[in-house]
Amino acid sequence: MIGPHDRALRERAARVIPGGLWGHQRAASLPEGYPQFFRGGEGCRVEDVDGRTYVDLMCSWGPIVLGHRHPAVEAAAQAQRALGDCLDGPGEVLVDLAETLVGMVEHADWAMFQKNGTDATTACVMIARAATGRRKVLVARGSYHGSAPWCTPVPAGTTDADRQHLIAFDYNDPDSLAAAVAQAGDDLAAIIVTALRHDLARDQELATPAFAQAARALSAERGAVLIVDDVRAGFRLDLRGSWAPLGIEPDLSAFSKAIANGHALAAVTGREGLREAASRVFVTGSFWCSAVSMAAALATLRELRRIDAPAVMAGAGQRLRDGLAVQATHAGVGLRQSGPPQMPLLLFEGDVEHRLGALFCREALARGAYLHPKHNMFLCAAHDDAAIDAVLAATEPALAAVARALREG
């Protein structure tokens, strides 16, 4: 049920903002009855503008990795804010952060910073083209790399020319990738691939060792650049980079979401051989040297390493996954859980239009758990046992409601 304050804000927004909001957080993309506007957050919980509190399993769609308003992160941000944020050049923290990131990410010899994931993936593509002098970029069908004209999933406002040098392949299919490489011929600049397959409304897939090895080998054979888009998964799965457990080192990686625990920042890391090309491309923005977000990122990365946050999140996510599996079996509902436990996706068998997913999420929301019916969710390090148990207390009757809907047709 949409609260009165939220409803009033939607009406006001509709008068002054096209569509009421832009992008993936607009109300039309949410289940009916979901709040659009929020007042604040603390730890693993958020409060909407009507004062209702939820255990948050979206974590601001990924940026919250330690928990909302994490004390160490906010203290670092406030200390830098007292000195200044946007100055005539970057603060000392820029170098501190770059050194920390290079020391953490396995393949990294250098780092550059931006504001959003799209900034980072676009910079990676530009660096690859500058380094190779070539144009073609291979992308997986259905993958999301941002909202710039070359990669946005919605074609409004773009032209065919924006994508004329992209060639598609199928994720986790080495043969499809090899065919795309052959199609690019001598004009292959880069292969860009998400750390895992996390397309909207389909089961997630971790990259297979065979696929990752093929991407690495084919890039090397053709003198092309292998880019891992780690914007969504970075620092949740592995602090060294999400493909480190596979033994694969990309040439470039793009990071954003979890890097600064909700403060606006993105990063590109790269190997030594691309340093010169990276220095030649012109990428910049009015707020790209903002010192406050960099101070927050430095504190975030240190805390992630101190507590081994990926393991903490994996444990919480597995507790949730195991509990949901038991509940779904008891309810007699076909629930598919996919992806790493830190980034769970829940889909129902036969639910092509996601009506069961929307019903499930509405019922859980009414009981204090904020989930999503077709987008992967995100765990953070603040999700303790009590929070996961609270989610499971909400999902059990929600699954029962799904079972009733199935029986009633």
Q: What is each residue range found by the language model?
A:
Residues 1-409:
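Conserved N-terminal phosphate-binding loop of PLP-dependent enzymes in the Aspartate aminotransferase
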